[in-house]
Amino acid sequence: LCSIVEPTIGVLLNIGTAHLEYFESVEGVAKAKGELLDYLGESLTALVNADDRVVVQEVQRTKGRLLTFGFVRESGFRGEGLVLDQEGCGHFLLHNNPIELKIPGRHNAYNGLAAASIGRILDVDWEDIQHALAQFEPVSMRAEIVRKDGLVVINDCYNANPDSMLAALELLGDVPGARKIAFLGDMLELGPQSGDLHAAVGAEVATKADILLATGKQSKELVAAARSAGMDETQARHFDNLDLAGEFISANMCRGDVVLVKASRAMAFDRVVERILQ
């Protein structure tokens, strides 16, 4: 990709558990993403997330101009005062300039901070940066919040991996509502670690959701872990197929509920969103 795009600025947002089937480990993912740093060499610029432990380890190999961004650790482009509004969208200060986002989720606050940082590296005016980020909206099926008849649906079903699942669950916890419902499916391309990674997500669901509905072979591990973490059989349910799960949620939704819908793209969870919003 570097040879095709020929970037002059490279950005490392995070290094996580996506595509482990192909890279085998987080270290393998780090090695692949680190190829961007190798390409940049000594004459080009790397912008990296100072709050991501694996990224920080990986950037030790960079030889060129290294710039950092983040909300927690000291960095050249440090976001301050991060708060989320009623839609879960981040508002923060960067070098005392207010940034307001229309994309929900704490993880997207990092994306917004990185984008603003790149703008400043390229000498874009603050007003232009603020306007552009305030106007940018999520694309379909990526942290897309839809409201209908008192129901809030977080449509995040374009794809899923363990890190994005955890980020979506955090968003579910941040959006106000009467009941928090996680409607989740399999995360694919995780290789031999798939069972353990689904279980880790299930344990987190128990801390963020009132109800877990799941379907898919691997999601049985997710439901089992949620039950082990404290959810009972009425709170954490597994369904044999998507249609049965869709029928259940359609019959049991209430005004004020917040429903997160997320799975790997091949699970076709967009069908669930369509059913919920009918």
Model-derived regions: residue spans:
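Short amphipathic alpha-helix with an adjacent loop that forms part of the alpha/beta core around
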Residues: 245-252
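Active-site beta-alpha connecting loops in nucleotide-dependent enzymes
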Residues: 139, 157, 161-231
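Short, glycine/acidic-enriched loop or turn micro-motifs at the edges of active sites
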Residues: 17, 52, 158-160, 189, ...
